[in-house]
Structure formats: C-alpha cells, structure tokens
C-alpha cells in the first residue's frame, strides 16, 4: 500500500461504480465492445469527466481475474487514525494478518452491512488494500473507515486504552461468541489469519477469546465467514438491547 493512501487502482463494475460515485475516478480504461453498455455509461456519468481510454481488452493491465471490462485509476483514500475508531458506539474488526485480499474485501463488505464502525489492518505481512480487495468489497471500502497500522498487538493495546473491549475469535475457546454481553459496549473483534488463527501476541491482548458454536465433526469456518457472523452478532445483540422496553 502506498504511504499516501490506498485504492489507487480499482477494477470491476461494482467497485469502479462506487469509486466513481465517491468522486475518486481520474482515468478509465474501458473495453471498446462494452463502452455503450448501460452499466459502463453509468460509470462514466458518475465519474464526471474522467480521462477515458478505449482498449480491446483490459485483462492484460488488470490485477483481478475478471475486471468486467473496466479499470480505473483513482485518487487514493486516506487511512483514518486508529484513535478515531474509538468512541461510545465503536464496533471494529481488527484483522490479524489476513493474507487473502478477497477475504479482506469480503470482510469489509460484511462489516459495512452489519454497521461496524471501522476496520484495522496491518501494513506488513498482510493482504494489501488492492484492486482484488476492492472488487471483493463491492464498494464497501469506499465507505467504511480503515486504520492501517504497523503492529496489530500494539493497536489492540491502544484500543483497550481507549475503552474498547477486545474479543478474539478462537475456534478452541470454550466461550460462546453468541450472546456476549460486552457486545453492547465499545468492542473490537479480532480475526486471525487463514489456517493459522490468532497470533500469540494478539491473543494475549484480548479480553475474551470466543468461538462460533458448530455441529460436531465440522471444520472451522473461513476467516471472512467467521468475521461476518461476529459482525452481525454484534448488530443483533445491540438491537435486542435497544428494543427491550424500559
């Protein structure tokens, strides 16, 4: 990720349309055979007056496998300071070295849909905020605040000092994720790397380690699925409290 920001290159119809709606698109590469399609014309209209290049095939310049005929060069998005994610209603997803950018994008999409207030990612040894992540996020990374930090354990300490409870997802924990009362408080859910789980240092910073209950004999869930379940459980718990009379 560039020091000045992320999201410089975006690919795919939904991701580029979201970047255009956010006013970030500076240049578009569009396949000639698709230029008159309604979805492409809509993107061009949303982008205002971008520099437009018509090409035979965008795949040779694309990072993603299926760019859907459109690639955009964009003004970068600036990360938010970590401290801006704390507060009374904080609901954060911290990614402990997630490596697959498609998982990163999928988690961002679920987090936004569940009303989470921000995401924390590592600048090192982790999936970049790349075109692949943006395509998987389908516009979510245009909206949800992202803090980019050098150390996840250090970030968790800072969040704790800011009054945020830290809940780590750990398949081996005997504590059930569903119904955790601290989800009504400022909280950050920590999702570990694919196939590895939480790092030792990240796990030590957690106030609670919790697992997703599963049927006997089933394998652990994908990181993005686990994150989605945690995000929507936070939403469910908070709504159940707000809907309680008195």
Locations of regions flagged by a protein language model:
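N-terminal positively charged helical leader segments and presequences
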Residues: 1-84, 243-246
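Structured adenosyl-cofactor binding patch, chiefly the S-adenosyl-L-methionine
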Residues: 17, 22, 113, 132-140, ...
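RNA substrate-binding interface of SAM-dependent RNA methyltransferases
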Residues: 24, 51, 87-174
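Short, acidic/turn-prone active-site loops that include or flank metal/cofactor-
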Residues: 33-35, 56-58, 124-126, 194-196, ...
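Short amphipathic alpha-helix with an adjacent loop that forms part of the alpha/beta core around
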Residues: 82-87, 158-160, 178-183
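Short glycine/serine/threonine-rich phosphate/pyrophosphate-binding segments
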Residues: 102-106, 198, 223
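Active-site/ligand-binding-proximal alpha/beta "capping" segment
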Residues: 167-222
């Amino acid at each position: 990720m560039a020091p000045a920001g992320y999201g410089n290159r975006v690919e795919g119809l939904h991701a580029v349309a979201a970047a255009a709606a956010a006013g970030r698109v500076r240049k578009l590469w569009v396949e000639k055979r698709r230029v008159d399609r309604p979805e492409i014309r809509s993107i061009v209209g949303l982008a205002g007056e971008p520099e437009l290049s018509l090409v035979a095939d965008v795949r040779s310049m694309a990072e993603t496998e299926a760019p859907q005929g459109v690639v955009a060069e964009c003004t970068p998005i600036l990360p938010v300071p970590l401290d801006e994610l704390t507060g009374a209603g904080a609901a954060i997803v911290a990614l402990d070295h997630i490596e697959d950018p498609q998982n990163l994008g999928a988690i961002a999409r679920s987090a936004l849909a569940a009303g989470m207030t921000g995401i924390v990612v590592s600048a090192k040894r982790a999936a970049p905020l790349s075109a692949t992540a943006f395509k998987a996020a389908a516009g979510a990374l245009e909206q949800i605040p992202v803090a980019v930090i050098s150390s996840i354990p250090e970030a968790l300490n800072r969040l704790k000092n800011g009054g945020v409870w830290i809940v780590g997802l750990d398949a081996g924990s005997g504590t059930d994720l569903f119904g955790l009362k601290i989800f009504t408080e400022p909280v950050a859910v920590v999702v570990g790397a694919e196939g590895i789980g939480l790092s030792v240092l990240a796990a030590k910073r957690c106030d609670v380690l919790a697992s997703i209950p599963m049927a006997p004999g089933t394998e652990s869930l994908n990181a993005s699925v686990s994150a989605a379940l945690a995000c929507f459980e936070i939403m469910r718990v908070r709504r159940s409290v707000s809907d309680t009379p008195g």
